[in-house]
Amino acid sequence: MNRRKETGELSRQQQKSLETKNKIFQAAKRILQKKGYEALSIKNICEEAKVSNGSFYHHFKTKDDLLSYYIEEQPSIDPDLLELPANAKEAEAAIVYVYLNYVHYCRELGVEFMANYYTPKNQSLNPLIRTERPYPIVTVHNYLQKCIDAGILSPRFPLEDITSDIRLIVIGNVFEWCLKNGDADFEGNMRRSLGKYLDAVLCKM
Protein backbone atom coordinates (compact mmCIF):
# COMPACT_ATOMS: atom_id res chain seq x y z
CA MET A 1 0.00 0.00 0.00
CA ASN A 2 1.38 3.41 -0.90
CA ARG A 3 2.42 5.42 2.14
CA ARG A 4 0.86 8.54 0.60
CA LYS A 5 -2.69 7.21 0.67
CA GLU A 6 -5.00 8.88 3.11
CA THR A 7 -4.58 7.51 6.59
CA GLY A 8 -8.35 7.24 6.87
CA GLU A 9 -8.12 4.12 4.75
CA LEU A 10 -5.80 2.46 7.29
CA SER A 11 -6.67 0.59 10.46
CA ARG A 12 -5.19 1.78 13.76
CA GLN A 13 -2.64 -1.04 13.63
CA GLN A 14 -1.65 -0.19 10.06
CA GLN A 15 -1.31 3.48 10.95
CA LYS A 16 0.90 2.62 13.92
CA SER A 17 3.05 0.42 11.67
CA LEU A 18 3.34 3.25 9.15
CA GLU A 19 4.40 5.66 11.88
CA THR A 20 7.06 3.23 13.11
CA LYS A 21 8.39 2.74 9.58
CA ASN A 22 8.61 6.50 9.14
CA LYS A 23 10.36 6.88 12.50
CA ILE A 24 12.95 4.27 11.51
CA PHE A 25 13.47 5.86 8.10
CA GLN A 26 13.91 9.36 9.51
CA ALA A 27 16.57 7.98 11.85
CA ALA A 28 18.36 6.33 8.92
CA LYS A 29 18.11 9.54 6.91
CA ARG A 30 19.72 11.57 9.71
CA ILE A 31 22.59 9.08 9.95
CA LEU A 32 23.10 9.12 6.18
CA GLN A 33 23.18 12.90 6.08
CA LYS A 34 25.57 13.27 9.01
CA LYS A 35 27.89 10.27 8.67
CA GLY A 36 27.25 8.54 5.33
CA TYR A 37 26.39 5.00 4.29
CA GLU A 38 29.31 3.40 6.16
CA ALA A 39 27.81 4.45 9.49
CA LEU A 40 24.38 3.13 8.61
CA SER A 41 24.06 -0.01 10.72
CA ILE A 42 20.87 -1.53 12.06
CA LYS A 43 22.21 -1.00 15.58
CA ASN A 44 22.79 2.71 14.92
CA ILE A 45 19.41 3.09 13.24
CA CYS A 46 17.59 1.48 16.18
CA GLU A 47 19.45 3.62 18.70
CA GLU A 48 18.70 6.80 16.75
CA ALA A 49 15.03 5.87 16.29
CA LYS A 50 14.71 4.56 19.86
CA VAL A 51 13.17 1.29 18.72
CA SER A 52 14.17 -2.32 19.34
CA ASN A 53 15.97 -4.55 16.86
CA GLY A 54 12.85 -6.71 16.82
CA SER A 55 10.75 -3.75 15.75
CA PHE A 56 13.19 -3.01 12.92
CA TYR A 57 13.14 -6.59 11.63
CA HIS A 58 9.37 -6.70 11.90
CA HIS A 59 9.18 -3.96 9.28
CA PHE A 60 12.36 -4.41 7.21
CA LYS A 61 14.67 -7.25 6.22
CA THR A 62 17.88 -5.21 5.92
CA LYS A 63 19.03 -1.59 5.98
CA ASP A 64 18.95 -1.57 2.16
CA ASP A 65 15.38 -2.84 2.29
CA LEU A 66 14.62 0.15 4.52
CA LEU A 67 16.11 2.59 2.01
CA SER A 68 14.30 0.93 -0.87
CA TYR A 69 10.99 1.28 0.97
CA TYR A 70 11.09 5.03 0.66
CA ILE A 71 12.29 5.05 -2.91
CA GLU A 72 9.61 2.58 -3.99
CA GLU A 73 6.81 4.08 -1.89
CA GLN A 74 7.00 7.45 -3.61
CA PRO A 75 3.81 9.07 -4.95
CA SER A 76 2.73 6.54 -7.55
CA ILE A 77 1.26 6.78 -11.00
CA ASP A 78 -1.01 3.88 -11.87
CA PRO A 79 -0.02 2.75 -15.38
CA ASP A 80 -3.67 1.84 -15.97
CA LEU A 81 -4.55 5.51 -15.57
CA LEU A 82 -2.07 6.63 -18.23
CA GLU A 83 -4.07 6.99 -21.43
CA LEU A 84 -2.87 5.06 -24.44
CA PRO A 85 -0.92 7.41 -26.70
CA ALA A 86 -1.83 8.20 -30.28
CA ASN A 87 1.77 7.83 -31.37
CA ALA A 88 5.37 7.30 -30.24
CA LYS A 89 5.82 10.99 -29.34
CA GLU A 90 2.95 10.86 -26.88
CA ALA A 91 4.32 7.65 -25.37
CA GLU A 92 7.70 9.31 -24.95
CA ALA A 93 6.09 12.30 -23.21
CA ALA A 94 4.26 10.00 -20.77
CA ILE A 95 7.45 8.15 -19.85
CA VAL A 96 9.39 11.38 -19.37
CA TYR A 97 6.55 12.59 -17.13
CA VAL A 98 6.91 9.51 -14.92
CA TYR A 99 10.59 10.22 -14.40
CA LEU A 100 10.15 13.93 -13.84
CA ASN A 101 7.84 12.85 -11.02
CA TYR A 102 10.74 10.73 -9.74
CA VAL A 103 13.10 13.73 -10.00
CA HIS A 104 10.73 15.75 -7.83
CA TYR A 105 10.70 12.97 -5.23
CA CYS A 106 14.51 12.78 -5.25
CA ARG A 107 14.60 16.51 -4.54
CA GLU A 108 12.25 15.98 -1.60
CA LEU A 109 14.61 13.39 -0.12
CA GLY A 110 17.60 15.64 -0.73
CA VAL A 111 21.06 15.36 -2.27
CA GLU A 112 22.66 13.87 0.85
CA PHE A 113 20.18 11.02 1.05
CA MET A 114 20.28 10.23 -2.66
CA ALA A 115 24.08 10.40 -2.82
CA ASN A 116 24.33 7.83 -0.06
CA TYR A 117 21.51 5.71 -1.46
CA TYR A 118 23.02 5.40 -4.94
CA THR A 119 26.17 3.60 -3.85
CA PRO A 120 27.53 0.25 -5.16
CA LYS A 121 27.31 -1.04 -1.59
CA ASN A 122 23.52 -0.69 -1.65
CA GLN A 123 22.67 -4.05 -3.16
CA SER A 124 18.96 -3.25 -3.27
CA LEU A 125 19.85 -1.39 -6.47
CA ASN A 126 21.21 -4.54 -8.10
CA PRO A 127 18.53 -5.78 -10.55
CA LEU A 128 20.13 -9.24 -10.59
CA ILE A 129 19.30 -9.93 -6.95
CA ARG A 130 16.14 -7.88 -6.47
CA THR A 131 12.78 -9.62 -6.29
CA GLU A 132 10.97 -6.34 -6.90
CA ARG A 133 12.04 -3.47 -9.11
CA PRO A 134 11.66 0.22 -8.19
CA TYR A 135 8.27 1.68 -8.99
CA PRO A 136 9.10 3.92 -12.02
CA ILE A 137 10.51 1.00 -14.01
CA VAL A 138 7.46 -1.14 -13.24
CA THR A 139 5.13 1.66 -14.34
CA VAL A 140 7.04 2.27 -17.57
CA HIS A 141 7.36 -1.44 -18.35
CA ASN A 142 3.61 -1.99 -17.96
CA TYR A 143 2.78 1.14 -19.93
CA LEU A 144 5.02 0.19 -22.85
CA GLN A 145 3.62 -3.34 -22.82
CA LYS A 146 0.10 -1.91 -23.15
CA CYS A 147 1.22 0.25 -26.07
CA ILE A 148 2.82 -2.72 -27.81
CA ASP A 149 -0.21 -4.94 -27.22
CA ALA A 150 -2.46 -2.21 -28.65
CA GLY A 151 -0.35 -2.04 -31.79
CA ILE A 152 0.73 1.55 -31.15
CA LEU A 153 4.45 0.88 -30.74
CA SER A 154 6.97 -1.51 -32.21
CA PRO A 155 10.22 -0.88 -30.29
CA ARG A 156 13.57 -1.55 -31.94
CA PHE A 157 14.75 -3.58 -28.93
CA PRO A 158 13.18 -6.09 -26.49
CA LEU A 159 11.16 -4.44 -23.74
CA GLU A 160 13.44 -5.74 -20.98
CA ASP A 161 16.45 -4.16 -22.71
CA ILE A 162 14.65 -0.84 -23.00
CA THR A 163 13.67 -0.72 -19.32
CA SER A 164 17.23 -1.69 -18.37
CA ASP A 165 18.62 1.13 -20.52
CA ILE A 166 16.18 3.59 -18.96
CA ARG A 167 17.30 2.50 -15.50
CA LEU A 168 20.93 3.21 -16.44
CA ILE A 169 20.04 6.64 -17.85
CA VAL A 170 18.15 7.53 -14.67
CA ILE A 171 21.00 6.39 -12.42
CA GLY A 172 23.41 8.51 -14.47
CA ASN A 173 21.24 11.59 -14.06
CA VAL A 174 20.86 11.05 -10.32
CA PHE A 175 24.64 10.59 -9.99
CA GLU A 176 25.33 13.80 -11.94
CA TRP A 177 22.92 15.74 -9.75
CA CYS A 178 24.52 14.38 -6.58
CA LEU A 179 28.06 14.91 -7.92
CA LYS A 180 27.29 18.58 -8.48
CA ASN A 181 25.66 18.85 -5.06
CA GLY A 182 22.27 19.63 -6.55
CA ASP A 183 23.50 22.31 -8.97
CA ALA A 184 22.89 20.24 -12.13
CA ASP A 185 19.79 20.83 -14.25
CA PHE A 186 18.19 17.64 -12.95
CA GLU A 187 14.85 18.03 -14.73
CA GLY A 188 16.37 19.31 -17.97
CA ASN A 189 19.01 16.59 -18.15
CA MET A 190 16.47 13.86 -17.42
CA ARG A 191 14.07 15.16 -20.05
CA ARG A 192 16.77 15.55 -22.71
CA SER A 193 18.64 12.26 -22.20
CA LEU A 194 15.52 10.13 -21.84
CA GLY A 195 13.86 11.89 -24.75
CA LYS A 196 16.76 11.30 -27.11
CA TYR A 197 16.95 7.62 -26.16
CA LEU A 198 13.22 7.07 -26.54
CA ASP A 199 13.24 8.88 -29.89
CA ALA A 200 15.70 6.27 -31.11
CA VAL A 201 13.97 3.13 -29.83
CA LEU A 202 10.22 3.77 -29.97
CA CYS A 203 8.64 3.23 -33.37
CA LYS A 204 5.03 3.49 -34.46
CA MET A 205 3.61 0.31 -35.97
What are these regions (language model features)?
Residues 24, 39, 62-67:
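Short amphipathic alpha-helical segment with a characteristic S/N-K-E followed by hydrophobic residues
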Residues 128-133, 149-165, 188:
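All-alpha amphipathic helical-bundle segments outside canonical DNA-binding/catalytic cores
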Residues 104-141:
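Short secondary-structure transition hinges
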Residues 69, 82-108, 159, 163-166:
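Hydrophobic alpha-helical connector segments
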Residues 49-60:
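Short hydrophobic/aromatic patch on the recognition helix
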Residues 71-78:
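Short, basic, alpha-helical segments at the C-terminal edge of helix-turn-helix-like DNA-binding modules
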Residues 1-35, 42-48:
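Basic, helix-initiating cap at the start of DNA-binding domains
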Residues 1-7, 96-97, 101-104, 138, ...:
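C-terminal peripheral helix-coil segments that are non-catalytic and often amphipathic
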